[in-house]
Amino acid sequence: MTPSLATKYVFTITARIDDVTSAGDIGHGTRRIIPIIGGEVHGEGIHGKVLPFGADFQIIRPDELIELEAKYALELDDGAVIYVENIGIRFGPKELLEKLKRNEPVDPALIYCRTTPRFETGHPKYRWLMRHLFIGSAARHADRVVIDVHQVL
């Protein structure tokens, strides 16, 4: 028998985003680039900001499934810098995805948006982030993405 899986909430990342740039149809979908321009991270023992660089490099596939690939960095209040690479997917009813594209509000419970963030840091206090797996539950808003990050125990 293998160990059972459980998760524990660890922190929330709120990444502010800027206007979408499209690279157009790349053969297997539409490539979109969404700049990450700042934000906050808050949780038990982790507080800081999202640094104002990085982006989410998305592909909207013909079946409307959205592949997410965000790369950015956090700077915590104690000076630690943590690189984040967050891979995921988002999908839902086509009409709701169209509303999101137009920056119209959509109830996050109606859109499936999950990610698998990975972290890198040389700061000894936060090296535990590199030794665990994490799952994110995310919600897209017009000006930000909110990700509740859970550690897989």
Across the structure, where does each feature detected by a protein language model lie?
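Beta-strand-enriched cores of mature, soluble protein domains
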Residues: 1-153
